[in-house]
Amino acid sequence: MLCLLGIQLQAQQPMYYDASRFPLLGKATQDTGARYERLPDSLKNISRPPLWNLSRNSAGMAIRFRSNSTRIALKWENLFNNHMNHMTDVGIKGLDLYCWEENGQWRFVNSARPNGKTNQATVIANMQPKEREYMLYLPLYDGLVSLSIGVDSLSSIDQPQINYPIREKPIVFYGTSILQGGCASRPGMAHTNIISRRLNRECINLGFSGNGQLDLEVARVMAEVDAGVFVLDFVPNASVEQMKERMETFYRIIRNKHPKTPIVFIEDPIFTHALFDQRVAHEVTRKNQTLNEIFNSLKKKGEKDIYLIHSEKMIGEDGEATVDGIHFTDLGMMRYANLITPFIKKMIKR
């Protein structure tokens, strides 16, 4: 009886597999010092320290796998154990599981909530034991030291059998804290991840909180990606002076490697508190005017396949799309995706 009970208990314990054995989506380069980092290790002593540290956040990355398990469990260790007062810990350093449905859409399953630096959680249980394709989104504002996926000990976990999201010609995004995912409630609600699911296309997130300042080495990393579209959303972080000094150079680094790939510029959002804060309103107007001037200058020089998305309707007019007047809630992320997705869809269908 004790032997039988021991076997039953053992069968109830999940078997864990290192996530490094499964495909990782959302990286611009494989030349990183660790698997879940975003910039090549060669930039460690070249990039500004805050930019480099943010590149160690796993924003926009996702693991793809397949399993017939009745449950999915996770073990993970965060790199920094970050915490912020305007964003959920799930969004910062948690994980987010989706599965592919027969109707041709990715469906949210559940999130894994962190309790600290080292974590263990059962994401979902009591499922029917049938084969499912999964996508696991990684933390937006922290990095990972390790990640393991747990399944029933008698079940299988394998490589994905469908090539979704499509990895050919990914969409490469560059930008700020908002683009990195601030302040989505969970990783799957970052707008780059929403757009990826809607288009079923891999997206690469090169958002760096407070540091989307047109650092030219980032443009060089982007230029090495065989992208379908490049989206440049840096205006909230870049000063007018930085735009005048670096924007065209940043653009040309990418354009020289990709003469016909669409490159999209996006205006600064009309932040909700700009209705009241005159200084903020003036700065947003000034930055957007500068962006438009440089963009129009490029057009006059004969540059083709460049586009500008205006921000008037980006996050709505009701003032309800941010957590602090600046960083998007899930509502803001959805509204951004609603504006951007149809435009990008046209670009990748050309």
Language-model features: where?
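Catalytic nucleophile-elbow at a beta strand-turn-alpha helix junction centered on a G-D-S/GDSL motif
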Residues: 168-192
